[in-house]
């Protein structure tokens, strides 16, 4: 597929995703057409984002399974080293987080500064997403490039609810961390 045609097709979908009243029927129809024409769903557009990044960015989580089933890899990073899962976590979109994980997103993948989705959930103070990621195998012992763990970030953010959850869940005594 020619680059100009690809950019035109991506622009079409991105513009539809950005509409206030997103017409999911139109988007799904267009995605099916692109799939039939062997559109590369892993191609990157502006700032290195794939179609899946734009789906997350515009809160259209209902089409996540379709985009992934058509071949979009949920573990591709954009130019800011964010996967769609990192984006969904920072947006606090728990439904998107669930769908991405169920469709193969890596819960332990390091992004910018080697921060995992769990690091970001803790930094954002989102206990529900923190619990969800841990239940799906997120490793609480992974550290970022500053050698900081999720517990370190919970302490930095003074998030006592997440600190207590982590201590109880992993039987960590005060002073042991």
Question: Which residues are covered by each model-predicted region?
Answer:
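Ankyrin repeat A-helix N-terminal signature
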Residues: 18-23, 54-60, 87-93, 120-126, ...
């Amino acid at each position: 597929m020619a680059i100009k045609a690809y950019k035109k097709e991506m622009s079409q979908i991105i513009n539809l995703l950005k509409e206030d009243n997103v017409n999911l029927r139109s988007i799904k129809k267009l995605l099916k057409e692109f799939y039939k024409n062997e559109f590369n769903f892993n191609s990157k557009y502006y700032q290195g984002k794939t179609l899946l990044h734009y789906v997350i960015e515009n809160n259209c989580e209902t089409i996540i399974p379709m985009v992934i089933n058509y071949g979009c890899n949920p573990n591709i990073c954009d130019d800011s080293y964010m996967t769609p899962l990192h984006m969904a976590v920072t947006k606090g979109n728990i439904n998107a987080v669930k769908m991405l994980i169920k469709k193969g997103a890596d819960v332990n993948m390091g992004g910018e500064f080697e921060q995992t989705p769990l690091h970001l959930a803790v930094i954002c103070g989102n206990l529900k997403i923190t619990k969800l990621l841990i239940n799906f195998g997120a490793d609480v012992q992974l550290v970022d490039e500053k050698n900081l763990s999720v517990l370190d970030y919970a302490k930095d953010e003074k998030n006592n609810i997440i600190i207590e959850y982590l201590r109880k869940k992993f039987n960590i005594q005060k002073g042991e961390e």
